[in-house]
Amino acid sequence: MPKIKTRRSAAKRFSQTGSGKFKRRRQNLRHILTKKAASRKMRLGQSTTVDKANEKAVRRMLPNG
C-alpha cells in the first residue's frame, strides 16, 4: 500500500487543535474593507473552528493531522 498523502492546500488552511478540532481563518478580510465596520473586521480577524458538517471532509484531507 502506498502512503496516504496530505492535501497540501488543506494543510495550509487548517490546523488541528489539541482536542482534535480544526482551526480555520474567517473569510471576507482580503479586500473591500473600507465599507466594513471596525468591529466586524476585528471579529473576522479571529480564527474559528470548522463546523461539524465539514469536519469529516477536512479530516479526510489531512490524514496525518
From Swiss-Prot:
<keyword id="KW-0689">Ribosomal protein</keyword>
<dbReference type="Pfam" id="PF01632">
    <property type="entry name" value="Ribosomal_L35p"/>
</dbReference>
<feature type="compositionally biased region" description="Basic residues">
    <location>
        <begin position="1"/>
        <end position="11"/>
    </location>
</feature>
<protein>
    <recommendedName>
        <fullName>Large ribosomal subunit protein bL35</fullName>
    </recommendedName>
</protein>
<dbReference type="GO" id="GO:0003735">
    <property type="term" value="F:structural constituent of ribosome"/>
</dbReference>
<feature type="region of interest" description="Disordered">
    <location>
        <begin position="1"/>
        <end position="65"/>
    </location>
</feature>
<dbReference type="InterPro" id="IPR021137">
    <property type="entry name" value="Ribosomal_bL35-like"/>
</dbReference>
<keyword id="KW-0687">Ribonucleoprotein</keyword>
<comment type="similarity">
    <text>Belongs to the bacterial ribosomal protein bL35 family.</text>
</comment>
<feature type="compositionally biased region" description="Basic residues">
    <location>
        <begin position="21"/>
        <end position="43"/>
    </location>
</feature>
<dbReference type="InterPro" id="IPR001706">
    <property type="entry name" value="Ribosomal_bL35"/>
</dbReference>
<dbReference type="GO" id="GO:0015934">
    <property type="term" value="C:large ribosomal subunit"/>
</dbReference>
<dbReference type="GO" id="GO:0006412">
    <property type="term" value="P:translation"/>
</dbReference>
<dbReference type="InterPro" id="IPR018265">
    <property type="entry name" value="Ribosomal_bL35_CS"/>
</dbReference>
<dbReference type="InterPro" id="IPR037229">
    <property type="entry name" value="Ribosomal_bL35_sf"/>
</dbReference>
